[in-house]
Amino acid sequence: MTQVVVPVRYPLSKHSRETLAEAIRIAEREGATLTVLHVDLYQNGKRVTRSELKRAVEEEFGPVPAARYAVRQGLLVEEAILEEAAAEGADVVVIGKKQASRWRAMVRRLVDDPDIEAFLREELDCDVVTVPAT
């Protein structure tokens, strides 16, 4: 089965809602399982539970069929997203434009390559969909 991973902020920002809406559309179109991911940064000291994340998503979109909710802890959002995508065997990762910029900066530091989508496709063997902010 196709696997879609979408990282979001909690509480859901406007851009996270737009990114999540696109991920839900892709998952429904592909008959895919959707993993909604939030990353708790150690340095922020905040803890979000999976039930809080699920409740926020369902308040905005209603029940999402075939959805899984994950919360990871880490120092870097990018690293946690890569780990979740690899662990889930993601076929598609849907990220917001702001996240793409952060990923791009991280990749430049690591491999001096500004093409984050090509990097992720190579590393994760998946499609990357970037949702522009409106």
PLM segments and residue spans:
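Gly/Ser-rich helix-loop-strand patches that form or flank binding pockets
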Residues: V92-T134
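Charged helix-capping and loop-helix junction motifs
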Residues: L20, R50-K54, R109-I116
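Small/aliphatic-rich secondary-structure junction motif
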Residues: T2-R47
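General small-molecule cofactor/ligand-binding pocket signal
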Residues: T35-L37, R68-R72, V129-V131
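Active-site phosphate/pyrophosphate- and oxyanion-stabilizing loops and adjacent acidic/basic residues
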Residues: I24, L82, A118
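Short, surface-exposed acidic-centric catalytic microdomains
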Residues: Y42-E59
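Mid-chain, well-packed structural core segment of small domains
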Residues: F61-A100
